[in-house]
């Protein structure tokens, strides 16, 4: 291994024909539990350049709020993440489960209902990297979940998994946008899939549905107005806007999307099944948690990014 999330391929296995290897790699991804898998080539086409320019405009406008890591230069130059990268395997984990929280429960975004997806996806991507080691000698790879400085939605779009919608989420025609994205960068040269094309059409349901008007125009989300940002990332003692019942994240712009209303598929993956307390706990119950209870309830959860004092802050806003 090169580092904690990279690998070098020194297997003496027979080199496969690139097209066969690409198909086999994507099949392996599906067998690991990913709902979608596709491959993009590096250097990329005009679309990645367009998405990079859009990111630069977004940053220049200050829409990242205080998320300084969004300015990491590696996000705009994939070669800095893995020198010599030629291909990107993009994968998507379907996290939608056809269950609902009780009306009395503080609202928690669905991505946080199950186990920490960073760990789940990283483990599965590493297995794919090790499998790739066995197939092609002398290649290098790096696994990336959304904590890596990568334009994950742009590369997933380039690999054909879906298109970036007007709410900023990647939308798949087969699954909607209830998807978590991961990538395996590799120096192996693999044939690319056809990039996805947008199917949003004239629909703009997500824009007026946002309770804080965070989607300032199609495809532009201002984090300074976003409930998800303020509940998860804002470290101030008070949040500057109403949370509208949300204590962790926000799913409104996804809930109103027709692609989710008509194409969401309930996942049976054990990693994304909801914890019982998420579905049924009340504001008063959550507000009474000690730090130890918080640690127990959120063990191996992506919601641990919301510290205990932030959790109480968010709950206090709900009254």
UniProtKB/Swiss-Prot annotation:
Complexes and interactors: Monomer.
Alphabetical list of InterPro entries matching this protein: 4Fe4S_Fe-S-bd (IPR017896), 4Fe4S_Fe_S_CS (IPR017900), QueG (IPR004453), QueG_DUF1730 (IPR013542)
Catalytic function, reaction form: epoxyqueuosine(34) in tRNA + AH2 = queuosine(34) in tRNA + A + H2O
Disulfide bonds, paired cysteine numbers: none
Organism of this sequence: Synechococcus sp. (strain RCC307)
Keywords in alphabetical order: 4Fe-4S, Cytoplasm, Iron, Iron-sulfur, Metal-binding, Oxidoreductase, Queuosine biosynthesis, tRNA processing
Compartments it resides in: Cytoplasm
Tagged with keyword Hydrolase: no
Residue intervals passing through the bilayer: none
Gene Ontology terms: cellular component: cytoplasm
Gene coding for it: queG
List of catalytic residues: 146
Pathway note: tRNA modification; tRNA-queuosine biosynthesis
Gene Ontology biological process terms from the UniProt entry: queuosine biosynthetic process; tRNA modification
HAMAP family, A to Z: QueG
Known cofactor(s): cob(II)alamin; [4Fe-4S] cluster
Major subcellular location class: cytoplasm
Family to which this protein belongs: Belongs to the QueG family.
Pfam families to which the protein is assigned, alphabetical: Fer4_16, QueG_DUF1730
Function: Catalyzes the conversion of epoxyqueuosine (oQ) to queuosine (Q), which is a hypermodified base found in the wobble positions of tRNA(Asp), tRNA(Asn), tRNA(His) and tRNA(Tyr).
Residue intervals of the 4Fe-4S ferredoxin-type domain: 188-220
NCBIfam families: tRNA epoxyqueuosine(34) reductase QueG
Protein name, UniProt field: Epoxyqueuosine reductase
Molecular-function annotations in GO: 4 iron, 4 sulfur cluster binding; epoxyqueuosine reductase activity; metal ion binding
Amino acids binding [4Fe-4S] cluster 2: 210, 226, 250, 253
């Amino acid at each position: 291994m090169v580092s904690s999330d990279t690998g070098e391929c020194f297997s003496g296995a027979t080199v496969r024909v690139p097209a066969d290897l690409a198909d086999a790699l994507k099949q392996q991804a599906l067998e690991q539990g990913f709902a979608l898998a596709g491959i993009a080539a590096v250097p990329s086409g005009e679309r990645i350049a367009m998405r990079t320019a859009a990111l630069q405009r977004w940053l220049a406008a200050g829409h990242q709020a205080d998320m300084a890591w969004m300015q990491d230069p590696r996000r705009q130059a994939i070669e800095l993440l893995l020198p010599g990268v030629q291909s990107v395997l993009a994968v998507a984990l379907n996290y939608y489960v056809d269950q609902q929280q009780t009306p009395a429960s503080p609202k928690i975004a669905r991505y946080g209902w199950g186990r920490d997806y960073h760990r789940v996806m990283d483990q599965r991507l590493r297995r794919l990297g090790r499998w790739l080691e066995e197939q092609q000698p002398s290649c290098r790879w790096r696994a990336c979940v959304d904590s890596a400085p990568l334009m994950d939605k742009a590369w997933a779009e380039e690999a054909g998994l879906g298109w970036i919608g007007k709410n900023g989420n990647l939308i798949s025609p087969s699954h909607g946008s209830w998807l978590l994205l991961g990538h395996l960068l590799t120096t192996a040269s693999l044939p690319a899939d056809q990039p996805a094309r947008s199917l949003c059409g004239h629909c703009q349901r997500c824009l007026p549905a946002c309770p804080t008007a965070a989607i300032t125009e199609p495809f532009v989300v201002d984090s300074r107005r976003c409930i998800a940002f303020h509940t998860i990332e804002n470290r101030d003692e008070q949040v500057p806007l109403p949370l509208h019942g949300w204590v962790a994240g926000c799913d409104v712009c996804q809930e109103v999307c027709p692609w989710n209303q008509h194409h969401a598929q309930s996942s049976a993956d054990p990693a994304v099944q909801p914890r019982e307390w998420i579905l049924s706990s009340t504001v008063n119950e959550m507000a009474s948690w000690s730090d130890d209870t918080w640690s127990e309830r959120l063990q191996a959860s992506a919601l641990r990014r919301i510290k205990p004092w932030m959790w109480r802050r968010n709950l206090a806003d709900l009254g």
